[in-house]
Amino acid sequence: MRLSVTKEDASGMQKILAFFRGEVVLTAALVLALLSFLLMPPSAAAFASVDVSTLCMLFALMAVVAGLRSCGLFDWLAAGVKARVRTCRGLGFLLMSLCFFFSMVITNDVALLTFVPFTLLLLADAGAFALMWTVVLETIAANLGSMMTPIGNPQNLYLYMSRGLALGDFVQTLLPYALVSYILLALGTLLLPAQRRETAQESAPALARDRLVLYLVLLAVCLLSVLKVLPAWVAAVVVALAVALRQPDLLGKVDWALLATFLCFFVFVGNVKAAPVVSQTLEQLLTGRETLVAVVCSQVISNVPATLLLAPFTQNVTGLLLGVNLGGLGTLVASLASLISFKLYGRSQGAQRGRYLLLFTVANFGLLALLLLLVWVLG
């Protein structure tokens, strides 16, 4: 019997391959999950390691943030910045600050997706260095600002939801590093030129106020879940129903690939943990070196996968929490949010990718070294 492949089949296969090429982290997670079944045969235990609460909370937050963006909230805020600040240095400071503080609520990825495109338009005529340096500062600010809250980035959410961290302990662990980071970033804006810039008066973008109220209420529901007042699944169901009824197209804007990546890593870690030799090796490697190992691991595989890989093999959750957050500094892949900025900048007119990457790397490793020195000083 002869098998024939139609054009539709070939086109479908090309789309699937293109999807996996575009989702490198998901592809790697899927391969690792499948390979891990060579260590341990498929069983219910592998899927018992899946943290459903984390997946529910991630989904709810991504849907709510997509809703807030669709209301024009972030465009409205950005327009307000443009209207009130007249110098390049002042704009750099405010844009960096917006990324730093907004990332605590809307995540580092979304903060960069929101403010970097605006930066590229606003500072297009400010000179190559001013534009690159502002985007670098925004990227670092989003990565480090997001560490201050359990919902700021996926690794925080996972550790907070799965390891029973108290909110007070969480904040106490990271607050000194966030404060020092913000001060250093503020000083970094002094490298920007201080000349005044003339900007045309523009009307502020309209806000969809009815939907804005809805998504702010849903954000409050998510925060109640983070504070452990409501179960995560309740928040996910409430958000899913509200979005499906009010704005169903937003469900397509949820990062389903990120959720699938988490699922694959949960399965991988469950199988690895069940293999005595591997689990004992990882436990010995981590003991007493949680922060440093997490930083180094993040440089290679990014901090979210590093968290999922290392978390089951240590009881020192605060050390790991600190390591995977500081580990977002360093290489371009240390935090996948950094790739967002790089791609956005790389598409801009006159982009100097090599120079940007050099500036990014020097700034990241310089700040990482200073913060690791602070870790040593604080003991």
Stretches with model-predicted labels:
Residues 3-5, 14-45, 57-72, 191-194, ...:
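Structural signal for alpha-helical transmembrane segments and their membrane-water exit/capping regions
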Residues 16-22, 44-54, 165-177, 204-209, ...:
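Interfacial loop-to-helix junctions that mark the boundaries of transmembrane helices
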Residues 52-54, 82-96, 125-134, 209-213, ...:
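Membrane-interfacial loop-to-helix junctions in multi-pass transporters
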Residues 79, 191-216, 247-252:
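Flexible interhelical linker loops that connect adjacent transmembrane helices
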Residues 95-97, 101-144, 308-322, 350-354, ...:
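Hydrophobic transmembrane alpha-helices that form the pore/transport pathway of multi-pass ion
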Residues 171-182, 292-379:
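C-terminal transmembrane helix pair
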